[in-house]
Amino acid sequence: MKKGFTLSEVLITLGIIGVVAAMTLPAVINNTQDKQFKAMFKKQYSALAQAILMVYTDGNDIPNLTHENWMDMSFYVCKISSQLKYLKSGINCSTIEKLGDSPDLNKTDYFNDSTKWHNDGEWFNKKGEPQKLNSGYLNMTFLLPDESMINFNCLRDIFIDVNGYKKPNTIGRDIFFVTLPPGKLNLNFWDRRTFENDKVNSCTNSYAVSITQTNYEDDCKNGCGWGCSPMYILD
């Protein structure tokens, strides 16, 4: 007659199962989250593209988005964000829209410090390295009804955190970017201004990353994570 398992054998087996689960479960959870974040980014990309088109076709409010920097187009930043039905804003859009065109945010204080992009060191690239944003753009941030957050960043980039202040706050997972080229309606990921510049977060020099049509896939898989933005939309 065969003997059953001893208590020690059962405990050892359960211990092994626990170790394996502890090693694999986080990866499974992350993969599931990443699929959700990817779908959320695609949704936000579509909503943002539609909002820009609506601003262009909204009665007499047809913007001339030819400046190289969102800071010089705060009026249109507010108009675009209004189409997204933002809940909170880091700039006082009610005042800015009354003034018309775009007040110079470098000279006049129209900021609302209750809403900002992530603080320095509280968001990360895909390698786990803390990130920083040029402080001049921290307030160019809007919280949306679905708890996502957008930031009109350096030059003509727009950063999107699909779940707002919730973790992981990591580029290529829940943080992405798009670009609106000068004088154009369609979002893309390459043409950031009127002269060649292929870097994301380029106003924060040591944190700027070159993303091109030839390196974005490798960056998504092995680099900082900004390359995941075009990879998820274009591939």
Annotated model-derived regions:
Residues 2-33:
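N-terminal single-pass transmembrane signal-anchor helix
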Residues 6, 36, 58-60:
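Short, Lys/Arg-rich amphipathic alpha-helical interaction segments
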Residues 49-68:
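Alpha-helix exit/C-cap motif
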Residues 69-235:
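Intrinsically disordered, low-complexity regions enriched in Pro/Ser/Thr/Gly and acidic residues
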Residues 25-48, 52:
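Aliphatic-rich helix starts adjacent to a transmembrane/signal segment
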